[in-house]
Amino acid sequence: MSSQDFVAEKVWLAESLRCDETDVSQQLIAGDASPRKFYRVTVVTQDRTTTHILMVSPPTENNEKFVLVHGFLTAADICVPRLKRADLDLGFFLLEDLGDLTFWMALQTGDPDAFYSAALRALCDIQALDVPPSILSIYDDAELQRELDVCPDWFFAKALSMTADGQGEAVFKRFSECLLSMAAEQPFGFVHRDYHSRNLMVREEHDVAIIDFQDAIVGPITYDVVSLLKDVYIVWPRARQLSWLKAYWQLLVNVGRLSTHSWPDFLRWYDMMGLQRHVKILGVFSRLWLRDQKPAYMQDIPVVIDYIREACSLYGEEYSAVADFWQWFEQTALPRAQRADWYTGL
């Protein structure tokens, strides 16, 4: 941060919090996959000490949408950090301080069943919302395909230095069409887009608060539950995933989002949606490394590939496009990945 930026933030914070600039201190606590930065702001006066979160977000980061979605979720009584003040021109957002306990951290010592139950209840509450068309765009075929194409553009071509060939392109095209058809079968609703262990904060008991929702969209009903249960940052055995997934499916049935006979379809949608998400992540993590100088994400590529391997093995017999993709991937891309410095295996 430049000294000029630091001064601008200090002035804005003092004005927002109605205190002197000398009362305010700030400490960087997090950055994420985007250019946004988060600071814990401490205000010390004669009467008391308070803390807040300052989000500094460039104009490229959907700032208007952040405010719009925040207002929508708040009005629906969904637990998100309180937005105390926002300046879209400066890219400054003053938020409630929810503490340091992320969902991921809580899982290291707490009861996973209790935490996942809370996260899935919150997700069901979101899925029950009626989203006005004016607020969110649709996760249509074009957007899903654009995400999938990040994989050949950044993972295959750049991270693995693979040369495009007609056979590989044809296999990927058929595979993509199969995944898009599975997405189109599903009921659509609010999609957070990154509903995972790093974007949930744990509050009192097992209550969870949701952050990082500015990329929300209207899309397939299984997208967010895949993000949570097939999390890149914490891996659970499939039996445990399915136990939580079945409980979530029952919640959706109870609120009328799904029929009582929809479990087999829901399970298939879940796994196939996971394929779309994880193939996309191969490209996204490669782009973060090569374009944005954030190489740490590459250490999670083996986990992503293992999720892809598992789903392809489950559905390869039913969908030839899935079997063909894994055969091609295993023969061409996987050996290159396993030789890379960032690949540690599982």
Residue ranges and their predicted role:
Residues 22-27:
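Conserved N-terminal boundary motif of the eukaryotic protein kinase catalytic domain
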Residues 283-346:
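ATP/Mg2+ or Mg2+-diphosphate-binding catalytic cores
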Residues 30, 34, 39-150, 156-160, ...:
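ATP-binding pocket architecture of kinase catalytic cores
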Residues 259-268:
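Histidine/acidic-rich helix-loop-helix segments that form or flank divalent-metal centers
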Residues 9-10, 14-17, 131-137, 143, ...:
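An alpha-helical support segment within catalytic cores of ATP-dependent transferases
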Residues 35-42, 54, 126, 176-225, ...:
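Active-site acidic catalytic loop and adjacent metal/ATP-binding pocket
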Residues 115, 143, 187, 192, ...:
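Secondary-structure capping and boundary motifs in well-ordered enzyme cores
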Residues 150-159, 221-258, 272-292, 304-312:
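Active-site activation/catalytic loop segments of kinase-like enzymes and analogous catalytic loops
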